[in-house]
């Protein structure tokens, strides 16, 4: 559904202004302090997609820092859940009155509590916040619509994308459609993501609705002047089909990896403390070929284009324990839900045979 065409022969001043304006919507993040990337999602001339990155929770010597990751993700909710203008208002209030910190915390927490009360059958917040952080950090794309605040509005549908991010690069606006998954294993998360990608990409009505959300209710209202109008034009796919834009569907899959995490080196004082993290990263990275082949097979199986997909896999010892720690950091009662992909049939040899690339 990406549009071609050209609105200029090269990057003019207006285009550069748009790129700078979108960059101002990026929020600071410390996700790399608790999540390590052992394989980056880079372009590969010998591979037709999807791009895939492998990440994992960092270690504190020999122990995965699961609680630290949970706390960091809850802290990032201050940026993830609040619309840009409300963030700016809280910044001004906090600058003059430190008690506003408590009001900001309560406002974010209330959004999650309200969402849980309205939709007790859904529990996707952890994955959505993780997706927000990683797409900002590793794709350099700013959030252009706060989906959590929209989901708590009475007249807004709860179903839809988990996030929409954008960056102006290589002469075009790149729009990232985000889908997050919490899975018992990487393969199941990939299969669930592929099914969601195909469902969204085949639904023209929902596709247009997501663009309308950005234009009407998103963070672009925090921009000013010509840059704001140019951004709105780029998200108007009906009124301005001639503008350069590309679209990518990003799956962020946080999954349990008990096998690799269960193999630990002996504690040795004659070695640096990070040998445990480096050992895990090496073993996990060895799965890269079969995991991206699985992702390609699943995307093709569901009729999605692997060349327009990006998959980021995030390994933790037990995703249920991470979710439990996230709710504890938030200060709300834990809720138990099935994990994504548990209801799917996965062949035992899915992804076997190595990476043909």
Name the predicted role of every residue range.
Residues 10-103:
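A structured, charge-rich N-terminal accessory region that forms the first stable segment of a protein
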Residues 108-132:
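A short, highly charged nucleic-acid-interacting micro-segment common to nuclease
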Residues 135, 163-165, 174-182:
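Conserved catalytic cores of phosphodiester-cleaving nucleases, focusing on short active-site segments
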Residues 139-155:
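A short acidic/basic microdomain associated with nuclease active sites
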Residues 142, 167-173:
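Hydrophobic/aromatic-rich core segments of domains that either
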Residues 156-160:
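A short, glycine/Asx- and small/polar-enriched loop/turn
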Residues 191-278, 282-289:
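Acidic, metal/cofactor-coordinating or nucleic-acid-engaging core segments within structured domains
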Residues 268-357:
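Extended, charged low-complexity segments
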């Amino acid at each position: 559904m990406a549009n071609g065409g050209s609105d200029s022969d090269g990057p003019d001043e207006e285009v550069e202004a748009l790129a700078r304006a979108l960059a101002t919507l990026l929020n600071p993040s410390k996700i790399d302090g608790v999540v390590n990337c052992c394989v980056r999602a880079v372009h590969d001339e010998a591979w037709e997609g999807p791009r895939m990155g492998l990440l994992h929770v960092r270690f504190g010597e020999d122990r995965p820092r699961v609680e630290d990751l949970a706390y960091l993700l809850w802290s990032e909710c201050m940026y993830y859940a609040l619309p840009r203008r409300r963030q700016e208002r809280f910044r001004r209030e906090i600058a003059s009155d430190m008690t506003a910190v408590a009001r900001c915390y309560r406002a974010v927490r209330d959004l999650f509590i309200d969402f849980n009360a309205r939709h007790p059958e859904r529990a996707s917040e952890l994955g959505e916040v993780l997706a927000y952080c990683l797409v900002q950090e590793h794709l350099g794309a700013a959030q252009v619509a706060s989906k959590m605040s929209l989901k708590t509005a009475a007249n807004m549908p709860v179903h839809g994308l988990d996030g929409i991010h954008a960056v102006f690069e290589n002469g075009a606006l790149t729009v990232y459609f985000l889908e997050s998954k919490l899975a018992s294993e990487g393969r199941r998360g990939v299969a669930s993501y592929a099914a969601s990608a195909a469902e969204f990409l085949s639904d023209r009505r929902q596709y247009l609705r997501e663009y309308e959300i950005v234009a009407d209710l998103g963070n672009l209202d925090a921009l000013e002047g010509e840059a704001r109008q140019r951004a709105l034009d780029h998200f108007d796919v009906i009124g301005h089909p001639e503008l350069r834009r590309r679209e990518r569907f990003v799956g962020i899959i946080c999954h349990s990896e008990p096998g690799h995490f269960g193999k630990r080196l002996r504690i040795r004082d004659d070695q640096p403390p990070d040998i445990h993290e480096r050992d895990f990263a090496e073993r996990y990275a060895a799965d890269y070929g079969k995991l991206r082949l699985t992702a390609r097979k699943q995307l093709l199986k569901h009729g999605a284009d692997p060349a327009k997909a990006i998959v980021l896999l995030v390994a933790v010892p037990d995703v249920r324990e991470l979710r439990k720690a996230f709710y504890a950091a938030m200060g709300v009662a834990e809720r138990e839900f099935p994990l994504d992909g548990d209801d799917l049939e996965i062949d035992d040899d899915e992804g076997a045979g190595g990476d043909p690339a």
